[in-house]
């Protein structure tokens, strides 16, 4: 591309051009023929060319044709419609680095002499490091700068009585000639609803001599009204009398509309950071502050005089003041950009975190002129970050520790084992001891859950006091503990440790005046690190523990290979299940859910059943687990879904069908398509299908599973969270994903209405459902007193043997028909 001379390029006075060039965001102005009229230094750096090589050229001179075509189409749209265009895209900058830029293009009218032309103003914002909250803040900065630096203003003067003496030619934008605004004629262009307030403010300034700063609407030549801001100050004689008023009228319509749109958006979607304040400051060459924007003054409560010089430092939080002064004035001395986060004292009390960014500005001859900068309020982002870090820490701990005893869980054990594996020799022998508290359930039933919990804590304390610091103690389930010892020398040593643990635990307990005896059984497995993985060790120790349970309290069993017989039996079940699924030997039963206000059946939950030819009915908990282990859960789940949809089509249109989804089904990226195909093939309306998930779906590969859930919900399917309340994160997922229904786990219903704790939890869930507009369902209702309680608490639906157990499809249909006939008879 050859350098050319272009007479139509934009020129500015040196100070204004220096300020534009000091702005770190690229600014580009094109004429109606899409030629570059102006590029600031940042834009030249982005393109990687000198300004003199760009002025007068078009995108086609510096970009590939396809990319230039895209920009040309965008520019044509901006010029023809006048609508602002914003696009975010990756840009390769000189040096090969790729940055993400948000480019905003708008149309402006450029007047030079008696002629005017449309120009395209493009401003780019780098949002690479701060794409979240800071992106909104930076966008606000660019918009504010475009208003203050590029939009024309209308100057005016008035005599001490307030009569307008002269006004700039751009007053014609109101549809009135400038001469018509003289005297008090400006009022003709003003919106009637704003005129009274403006006249009062003007009269107040005339009476006191205080500056005028007022916003109002003026007529637009093309029709309607636009928002403007007028500011004015006085020139006084030596005796203090006012000689003349000097003011400007600034078009703030776009900014006003933007702020109003942002407020509305924030109220509607409760977004944050889109309308955060932007504070602008300018310094002279000596570092003394010459100007602070109105937003700075409003935030800090300072006046312009108080903020001048080094006075702005008085608004900095005392704990940050010395560091801020040192960093900023060092940057001034070195003429280097500055960026720092610190706290400002708020005018109304408290403090606000800001990120302050300053850039040196230079004259065309290289003379240092001072700094221009912005301060952005990032209080919400800082607070959210602190809360997020704290929540992450808590979640990390909760995910790896038992809430009751504070002991690590299986996940912690696995991570700790991996860490140890990097520091011990392959030949090092390890021992895993699985301990089961024999008779704990009887103690829990006899003395109550509180005593049982207290007993578990006492057992934990004894084990902690006995074990070595290098041992790892975990609680895997209600009454099962695991001990990992590294560096065991022999099987005899492992058995001795097991006996010592039994002796420690079986010593008598005194719990709140109650004497309690407890027995323990131990299953252990020992191997070198290179022989078995941790999961294999735990698995073999579990096998030994199951054998130990048959021997009663005090029994110790060490794993032997012959104990794998049970595993082989389980493998046979896997083969049998695969055969049953292929031959269609499985069945789907349907358990009713009833509306608690009308008593009407609204839903049937589809439940898989396996009538085994030899074993009889196989427990769903058993064969579902086998299906998940073998990968059969995918085809099994799809079969259940299709069977349920096929049957539900036959029911009345007000009756839905609920199907449970296994977390493993979400590993199939086509799950949403499977649901859609089942609905289309069977003809079932999507609103009559309810899919129930447990929160483990959201714990594993949360982002991917959430996306799948969103795709399913977009089909119109109802999504319910099952077993609500059994995990620590249930509440957080109500905020993460808009569930349609909550199903309260049966464990909270069993003790109703006697258990105050269960009643409090049930009441809280009902309140959450009402607040969020979510349907609330209770599982496991088997007694009338339970039903009366949940009705009183305001639940919507209930399920349980009080309403009916799982039924074959024909009986479910018969039940619906009988209900329908009863209802018809009652009418």
Curated annotation (Swiss-Prot):
Annotated Pfam families: EAL, GGDEF, PAS_3, PAS_4
Where the record annotates domain GGDEF, the positions are: 428-561
Q: Which Gene3D superfamilies match?
A: 3.30.70.270, EAL domain (3.20.20.450), PAS domain (3.30.450.20)
Q: Where does the PAS domain start and stop, copy by copy?
A: 12-82, 265-335
| Keyword ATP-binding attached | no
Domain EAL, by residue range, is 570-820
User: Keywords, A to Z?
Assistant: Plasmid, Repeat
* Domain PAC as annotated: residue spans: 212-264, 338-390
Cross-referenced PROSITE patterns:
EAL, GGDEF, PAC, PAS
Q: Any idea what this protein is called? A: Uncharacterized protein y4lL
Organism per entry: Sinorhizobium fredii (strain NBRC 101917 / NGR234)
